[in-house]
Amino acid sequence: PGTGSARVDTGEPFLDHMLVTLARYAGLDLDVQARGDLRHHLIEDVGIVVGAAVAALAPATAVRYGDRTIPMDDALVHVSIDVGGRPYYEGPLPSGLYDHWMRSFADHARATLHVRVIRGRDRHHVVEAAFKALGLALRDALAESGAVFSTKGSASVRVEP
């Protein structure tokens, strides 16, 4: 979907770093300019809009699934994602703010997202490994497959007054 370039300015340096990392590993182009009244709201809102952007990008014929495990020094984090339209998040990350970012992202990307911290002492390393793993898993999940990966078919509803 892009080249992995990012222009990010949220006023929150670690969030900026995570978004640049996500863009690079996912191969997505991100341009994020954001400010918030509270740090919590800012991080949540950015998760919401990045998730919504990913939902808009996901083709009906996407592979849908991505699964990556990333080591970063003391940290080892596994991420599995399905961009098939069923929002669900299973964590947690050791940082409540970035755990909430992942939940907000998953809800608005309409993705099932599992983030499993296998080990790690340094919260920075754990969160960064999670964003790297998410990026690589997204790159795989958003790839074009040429077919719709679903056995459910479709349903339609007609409502008359």
Model-identified regions with their sequence ranges:
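Polyanion-binding surfaces on beta-sheet-dominated domains and ring/shell assemblies
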Residues: 1-161
